[in-house]
């Protein structure tokens, strides 16, 4: 049985100094997880208030809740690692572990599947947004997010069981995770350039009798969202690649026997990567695209929380008064009025020339 568990309160004499250092860091990790609970509530609030499509928001909230699942599992594991909760020596030798420790490992493995699949989930959501481009903003089509999240939950649950009971080598599972990240990134790029090329074709006044204003608007929105998701997918893929290498090494039984000290530090590095992954993903989501950055800064609660942290870096954005928030219908009508005025000017010029 493979557990995400590496006790540091009781180590061999030659590793006591190293274990003691990691022992105190684990206490810091517990504190960081307590701080992350309210900080990610801020992210959930911003996601609910975001101007994205219902399905994209739903998938984002699903992934955020998946991180809370990881926090629960990791918190319980940390208590076992520092000795607040203990495993009997004879039980550890016979690989008989308490149920809370087993469940906490399952929760952590489940989140690893979520981290690998987030890019694929948003890529498929953008696929449906591209396929139903004419009516995607008008109809929520909740079945898309429910279908993706349901399939995603089953896949992550199965992968967690496979990794826990070592049904497949960790190297195979790590390769599969990296492959999914790379494949979703390529799939995403194809969708991005499909939307970009189609919008460019429309803007060049080709097939004007086929395309409507709603198609123009939706393609423009798709490209804005994809600019943000491009950074998310790229960062997720790179992070998954690094974490896959670390996980494969320190979960290898032969590596544990040959390099116990390196295994201890790799386990420590993996946990650091998970913490950094969540914080950096938050930064990327909020600060990647100026339009969305301005939107998040217009939320009063977000401005109060983030100004002490990033106010100097984005003084121009924070110095502006919060923008008036429009509904999707208002934004759509404003966009259509602008396009209609441009078309009217063009047709007036054509009529003048014909006269």
UniProtKB/Swiss-Prot annotation:
InterPro entries: 7TM_GPCR_serpentine_rcpt_Sre (IPR004151). Pfam families: Sre. The gene is sre-1. It is found in: Membrane. It comes from Caenorhabditis elegans. This is Serpentine receptor class epsilon-1. Belongs to the nematode receptor-like protein sre family. The chain crosses the membrane at residues 28-48, 56-76, 102-122, 144-164, 172-192, 232-252, 268-288. Its main location: membrane. The keyword Membrane applies. It comes from the Eukaryota. GO terms for cellular component: membrane.
């Amino acid at each position: 049985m493979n557990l995400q568990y590496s006790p540091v309160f009781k180590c061999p004499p030659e590793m006591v100094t190293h274990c003691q250092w990691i022992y105190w860091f684990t206490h810091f990790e517990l504190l960081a997880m307590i701080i992350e609970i309210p900080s990610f509530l801020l992210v959930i609030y911003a996601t609910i208030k975001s101007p994205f499509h219902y399905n994209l928001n739903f998938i984002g909230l699903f992934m955020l809740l998946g991180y809370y699942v990881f926090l629960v599992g990791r918190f319980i594991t940390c208590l076992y690692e520092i000795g607040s909760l203990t495993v009997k020596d004879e039980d550890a030798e016979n690989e008989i572990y308490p149920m809370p420790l087993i469940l906490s490992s399952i929760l952590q493995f489940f989140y690893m599947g979520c981290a690998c699949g987030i890019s694929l989930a948003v890529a498929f959501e953008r696929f449906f947004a591209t396929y139903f481009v004419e009516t995607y903003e008008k109809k929520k089509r909740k079945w898309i997010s429910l279908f993706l999240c349901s399939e995603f939950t089953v896949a992550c649950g199965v992968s967690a069981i496979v990794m826990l009971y070592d049904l497949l080598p960790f190297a195979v599972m790590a390769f599969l995770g990296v492959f999914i990240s790379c494949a979703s990134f390529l799939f995403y790029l194809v969708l991005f350039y499909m939307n970009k090329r189609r919008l460019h074709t429309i803007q060049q006044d080709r097939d004007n009798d086929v395309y409507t204003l709603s198609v123009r608007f939706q393609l423009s929105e798709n490209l804005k969202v994809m600019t943000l998701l491009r950074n998310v997918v790229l960062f997720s893929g790179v992070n998954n690649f690094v974490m896959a290498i670390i996980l494969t090494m320190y979960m290898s039984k032969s590596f544990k026997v040959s390099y116990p000290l390196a295994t201890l530090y790799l386990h420590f590095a993996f946990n650091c990567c998970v913490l950094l992954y969540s914080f950096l993903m938050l930064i990327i989501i909020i600060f990647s695209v100026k339009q969305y950055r301005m939107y998040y800064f217009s939320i009063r609660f977000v401005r109060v929380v983030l100004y002490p942290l990033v106010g100097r870096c984005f003084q121009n954005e924070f110095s502006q008064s919060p923008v008036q928030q429009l509904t999707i219908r208002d934004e759509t009508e404003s966009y259509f009025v602008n396009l209609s005025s441009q078309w009217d000017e063009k047709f007036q010029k054509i009529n003048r020339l014909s006269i």
